[in-house]
UniProtKB/Swiss-Prot annotation:
Protein keywords: ATP synthesis, CF(0), Chloroplast, Hydrogen ion transport, Ion transport, Membrane, Plastid, Thylakoid, Transmembrane, Transmembrane helix, Transport
Name of the protein described by the UniProt record: ATP synthase subunit a, chloroplastic
Membrane topology: Multi-pass membrane protein
GO molecular function: proton-transporting ATP synthase activity, rotational mechanism
InterPro entries hit by this protein: ATP_syn_F0_a_bact/chloroplast (IPR045082), ATP_synth_F0_asu (IPR000568), ATP_synth_F0_asu_AS (IPR023011), F0_ATP_A_sf (IPR035908)
Length: 248
């Protein structure tokens, strides 16, 4: 049996694919705590981008808006319409900042994973990646969403809010409680899985066919990243609206 050069190349390609990693964490040691440094660094970058755009778009408000102000106003109107549709005309205004923050943070985080070459930035240990590429970030967003609709329901309906857990029968109390936690957690796992899968697919394709095939996949990744941000924010707003209206 002869081993041809082509077969060696094919085995080499397979080895490169098998070497693609999910990610190496970069930790900060603070006392006895280990903090995910790469998540904090990239999150600060995302927050900095959002604050910069907000500052540039609102520092000199004009009757005839410039391009940046026009863009900021369009985004704000989009978020207000989303919150109004899901929460309701009477209650949505108080929740526009929360829903908008969720949507914009997830959207910019997802796009940063597709557009910013984080892996080219060398660190002593580990590597940088989009904030939503870490399960800790998405679970934290899910817990914030859970806290938000618990607060919304209790603030609007008082102690009667907890009566929904006894419907339609008290036997379902544990399941109803579990459901309120699993709904946002399912969002977090979906978001994490989609962003991680997108980065892994691009990494595998780059190892096989550099520059050619990955480009369409990157555009597809940008589209799905935007859709994931919209889904998370829309369902979070829907859960908040449902908690204030009652159990359906």
């Amino acid at each position: 049996m002869y081993i041809t050069e082509a077969s060696i190349d094919s085995y080499s390609s397979l080895y490169q694919i098998s070497a693609v990693e999910v990610g190496q964490h970069f930790y900060w040691e603070i006392g006895d705590l280990r903090v995910h440094g790469q998540v904090l660094i990239t999150s600060w970058v995302v927050i900095g981008i959002l604050l910069t755009v907000a500052f540039l778009g609102t520092r000199k408000l004009e009757t005839v808006p410039n391009a940046t102000q026009n863009f900021v106003e369009y985004v704000l109107q989009f978020i207000r319409d989303l919150a109004r549709t899901q929460i309701g005309e009477e209650e949505y205004r108080d929740w526009v900042p929360f829903v908008g923050t969720l949507f914009l943070f997830i959207f910019v985080s997802n796009w940063s994973g597709a557009l910013v070459p984080w892996k080219l930035i060398e660190l002593p240990h580990g590597e940088l990646a989009a904030p939503t590429n870490d399960i800790n970030t998405t679970v934290a967003l899910a817990l914030l969403t859970s806290g938000a609709y618990f607060y919304a329901g209790f603030h609007k309906r008082g102690l009667s809010y907890f009566g929904k857990y006894l419907q339609p029968t008290p036997v379902l109390l544990p399941i109803n409680i579990l459901e309120d936690f699993t709904k946002p957690l399912s969002l977090s796992f979906r978001l994490f899985g989609n962003i991680l899968a997108d980065e892994l697919v691009v990494a595998v394709l780059v190892s096989l066919v550099p520059l050619v095939v990955p480009i369409p996949m990157m555009f597809l990744g940008l589209f799905t990243s935007g859709i994931q941000a919209l889904i998370f924010a829309t369902l979070a707003a829907a859960y908040i609206g449902e908690s204030m209206e009652g159990h359906h």
